[in-house]
Amino acid sequence: KDLLRGATSALSYFPPAQISTVNDREHRCFIDGGVFANNPALSAYAEFRYHNSNLHAKDTMMLSLGTGRKTTNLDCEVTANWGAAEWLYQGSYLTSNAVASASDYQLNAVYDNKPNYLRLDASFDDEQSSSMDNTDKEYLDYLISLGESIVKEKQSEINTFAEELIKTD
């Protein structure tokens, strides 16, 4: 419970989580896991290989579930006038999207582009807020429909992944 609270304590939304070791000798401060790995699938694969060096991507399957991403298209004329605050705000989206995309790209290469690897992630519409603290019913309904649309869009890949998962050799 404490670890999940720490890993999801998004900066400026939730306070950091102070977690004690089992023997209560050390206390650590944990913040949003996305600061380290916005798409932790690649880190999970590396950790898996560390503990299972005899197994390879062809012997495993990975389903990576994203939390959605904001599409950011840069306009050079607009960005030329940005100051530090705007770059800091927009830069956080750019950085998190780039890191998540890079992890997805690398895992596609490791898994040789299917069927053992599948990432589901959706893009927020430009006119929709992607704010984590938006709990308006209209926005929550939008998120549900966004999730349903990504499943519909990727239904074929989901079916192939599921068939591969239950296959017996």
Regions found by a protein language model. Give the residues of each.
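Conserved catalytic cores and adjacent C-terminal regulatory segments
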Residues: 1-169
